[in-house]
Amino acid sequence: MANKEYNVKEFFKTDLPAYAAYDNARKIASYIDGQKISMRKILYTLLKKYPGKEKIKTETLANVCAAFTNYLHGAANLCGVCNTMAQNFVGANNYATLNGNTGGFGTRYDNNCAAPRYTKVALSEIFKKLLNENDEEIVGRQFFEGDYIEPKFFVPIFPILFLNGASGLSTGFSQDIYPRNPSEIIEYIKKKISGVEKPRMQLLPWFRGHLGKVEFNKELDRNESFGVITKNNMTSYTITELPIGIECKKYIEYLDKLCDNGTICDYNDKCDTETDKILFEIKTTRDFTKKHEGRKLFETLHLVKSLPETLCCIDENNRVREFTSIQEILDAYIEIRLKYYNLRKDYLLKTIKKSLEELSSKYLFVKAIVDKTIVVANKKKDDIVKQIEKQPKILKQDGSYEYLLRMQIYNLTAEKLEELKCQIKSKKEEFDSIKKTSVEDMWTNDLHELKKVL
């Protein structure tokens, strides 16, 4: 193959920035829905193709997703993404967006996943509750290579970024964001949309099922995760939790080193690989116990780990945005989400108004037939249309009265008239209820329902 000359200046001016922008969008999660492109494609495929509770083989889903959403990087990569999304052990996802078969997606003791031909996944019930079907029409879908694919982002009622966290390394940027306590995030959102400009909340990282504590270290200016250790006597300790980010297998290797260099005498590994319960019994000397108290004990036994964060996210324009605090990310999310609540409200009112117009026209049409103002028996279609046109309050739909002319004969009765009357009343009440409800109250109501299942 002949060498091709390429203008270096042109490469750095056009090709490299284009690649970097695409790479960033792939590898860094959005602050709006907490998803990377591949994750969003998987969720969209499940929503459209397999919305039920029945699980589908991971391998099958990956292949269907690659074709359905025009994924450019192969089904094998999507299998790995599914594995990450389905992991639900402590330190992985707090609330996995995919519901996988137990044990197939790793544990705290061994986070390796089974082969994708053996594992199965489905949408988690939590994820379904994070989305509102009325938002789908508002967000719209992207158009790629002649096909409609997934939206640029979902608009969940809760920032999924802080439900499970996110990490990624791309061209020139990286992302490391830990999950937060959903109750605290909901409280922050409620305060913010109720008018509190800067809610004073610490919002420390939170890991579901983790027994240790997370504290902010002012000297290091970062959060730290602690394990749990109990002193039994002067020569014995029991460890019942490890810091976030330290795997059981790696910790055993570290304990072996402590034994080899004489720091500790011995240890017993009593961890339960079935339940992920952590339990190590440590044997030490009296001298060790005297010299190791407080933080020094935690540091020596690797029971404290820093949780540094890099607050880079993809924004609504698929560009990297660097934030300075968790609160700043939340504020940006709230601004976007409120925008879409306004759009949802407008969409609902418009949809209900259109439905009301149709029901009212049907009511007037049926009433006219019952009252014999309009006669349809032995009449040509054009004659019926002319009679309808004399009723100014009966509206056309898509430029014609076809929706009325197609009504079944049993709908042209006094009973149907009463039914339509009830439907109109119900729709008017729904319209009035939505109209008088503020978008802030709509969101608060959604969060109230979500909190019941978190």
What are these regions (language model features)?
Residues 1-222, 281:
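Catalytic phosphate-handling regions of large nucleic-acid enzymes and associated NTPases
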Residues 195-454:
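Charged, surface-exposed alpha-helical interface/stalk elements
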